[in-house]
Design a protein with these regions (language model features):
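Conserved Class I S-adenosyl-L-methionine
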Residues: 25, 96-190
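Short conserved AdoMet
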Residues: 6, 10, 41, 55, ...
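A short SAM/SAH-binding and catalytic strip from SAM-dependent methyltransferases
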Residues: 29-44, 66
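Conserved catalytic/acceptor-binding region of the Class I
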Residues: 44-45, 51, 55-128, 150
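Class I SAM-dependent methyltransferase SAM/SAH-binding core
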Residues: 1-24, 30, 44-45, 49
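Active-site beta-alpha loop architecture of Rossmann-like, nucleotide-cofactor-dependent enzymes
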Residues: 22, 38, 67, 140
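Membrane-interface segments of envelope glycosyltransferases acting on lipid-linked substrates or membrane lipids
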Residues: 3, 16-18, 35-39, 50-55, ...
């Protein structure tokens, strides 16, 4: 990902670091996190910490998927819990990121001195059948479940996941499946 970013924006400096310990060299005009912070524990501490790096008149801008309770993610957890891989995947099921209520983010950042805007939006993606839904999550939500498995187990896991997905997302007349994808947006200004 960073190599691709360097190619696209060669004048910028990209550094791979752990966001939980990262500290900028100087206050920043913009701290932008797109679909990254949901993987962090302890949002009550981490978001105010990140806001602390924002310069005067600067912004912390965050977008996080809030999909834990969506049928797609319930299917992943069910598939993980019921297959022959259940014991190996149990820690992953327990470690699924939990996004707090939007009111919590407001309170945490307002207490840190931010002027906060927070809202949710649900995007609806028209995907090519159940396979389109599985493909959509193959590089994101399914990764923690698939990575520990052997190739044949991955195939079996995906087959079971497809079955669970099909029970929740029926195709439309044109064969498309409508996938709701809720997101949380936060803009915190100093």
């Amino acid at each position: 990902m960073l190599a691709h970013a360097r190619e696209r924006v060669p004048a910028a400096r990209f550094v791979r670091q752990d966001i939980t310990t990262w500290r900028p060299e100087a206050p920043l005009d913009l701290v932008f996190a797109n679909a990254a912070l949901q993987f962090l524990p302890d949002h009550a501490a981490q978001l105010p910490r990140l806001f602390g790096f924002v310069a005067e008149d600067g912004i912390l801008a965050v977008q996080m998927p809030i999909t834990l309770h969506e049928a797609s993610h319930a299917a992943m957890r069910l598939t993980a819990a019921e297959g022959p891989w259940a014991r190996r995947l149990a820690p992953i099921v327990r470690a699924q990121p939990v996004i707090a209520a939007f009111e919590d983010y407001y309170e945490w950042l307002a207490a840190a001195g931010a002027k906060v805007e927070v809202w949710t939006t649900t995007y609806v993606h028209a995907l090519d059948g159940v396979e389109g839904v599985v493909d959509w999550f193959a590089g994101s939500g399914l990764r923690p479940f698939l990575d520990p498995l052997e190739e044949t187990e991955r195939e079996a896991f995906l087959a079971r996941d497809r079955t669970a997905i099909a029970e929740s997302y029926g195709p439309r007349a044109d064969g498309k499946v409508l996938l709701p994808y809720p997101r949380l947006f936060i803009v915190a200004r100093r």
